[in-house]
From Swiss-Prot:
Keywords: Nucleus, RNA-binding. SMART domains: RRM. Disruption phenotype: No visible phenotype. Nsra and nsrb double mutants are less sensitive to auxin. Expressed in root meristems, lateral root primordia and root vascular tissues. This is Nuclear speckle RNA-binding protein A. The gene is NSRA. It comes from Arabidopsis thaliana (Mouse-ear cress).
């Protein structure tokens, strides 16, 4: 009797199965109403995102390049023939590449194209606010006593507006001391001289010598004076 009763109970009460699955339409929202954060496996398609207008960006970049290049010598990336002639478009080199090939070292804050690292775009030389004492001649300190005028000219020749180097060597006031080198570099105008000054300030000529001095440049107070040249050529 007891066995028959329990068999009837088992037939009437089946063990509960798993949760019933709802149709997909019950829990899936239309693709147009789903947000990015809805569902862990959903990723928006490319057409769902806003695509910037590349034509607008390109035209703005073109205007930026034109504004940078509109000034005289607006960048330190300049083309100049190796023989010291006028600027040429076929032999363009940056001052960074030129100096690295010579073995020199630029300051740590020196950025590409001769500009210091910063968030502002490079300002064209013609639009730069020059100091009141700016002149077209730079006075350079920190050159080794045995350097020649040709070596100094190699450093400044890539800059637009470069004219010539005047090197004067004086005897030291101390016995057995190294000669004193006075260096003057002439440019066509103060703006070109300011570009070279900002690019080469703190430049070290020889990275292999631990005691190599850093160049210190400033505008010459007497740009018109031309002392006798006793420097090595």
């Amino acid at each position: 009797m007891a066995d028959g009763y329990w068999n009837q109970q088992r037939q009437q009460h089946h063990p509960p199965g798993g949760p019933m699955k709802r149709p997909r339409s019950d829990f899936e929202a239309p693709s147009s109403t789903m947000t990015i954060g809805h569902g862990g496996g959903y990723y928006p398609r490319d057409e769902d995102l806003d695509v910037p207008d590349t034509r607008t960006i390109g035209s703005a970049y073109d205007r930026y390049l034109q504004s940078v290049q509109s000034g005289e010598g607006g960048s330190v990336s300049m083309g100049r023939s190796g023989g010291g002639g006028g600027g040429g478009g076929g032999n363009v080199q940056t001052i960074d590449d030129f100096m690295l090939r010579r073995g020199g070292v630029l300051p740590l804050d020196h950025g590409p194209n001769g500009h210091t690292i910063g968030f502002d775009p490079p300002e064209p030389v013609g639009r730069r606010n020059l100091p009141s004492d700016a002149s077209n001649t730079l006075y350079v300190e920190g050159l080794p006593s045995n350097c020649s005028r040709r070596e100094v000219a190699h450093i400044f020749r890539p800059f637009v507006g470069y004219r010539e180097v005047r090197l004067v060597t004086k005897d030291s006031k101390h016995r057995n001391g190294d000669p004193i080198v006075l260096c003057f570099v002439d440019f066509t105008n103060p703006a070109c001289a300011a570009t070279a000054l900002s690019a080469l300030q703190g430049y070290r000529m020889d990275e292999n010598e631990s005691d190599s001095k850093f160049l210190r440049l400033q505008f010459s107070r007497k740009p018109g004076s031309r002392p006798g040249q006793r420097g090595r050529r």
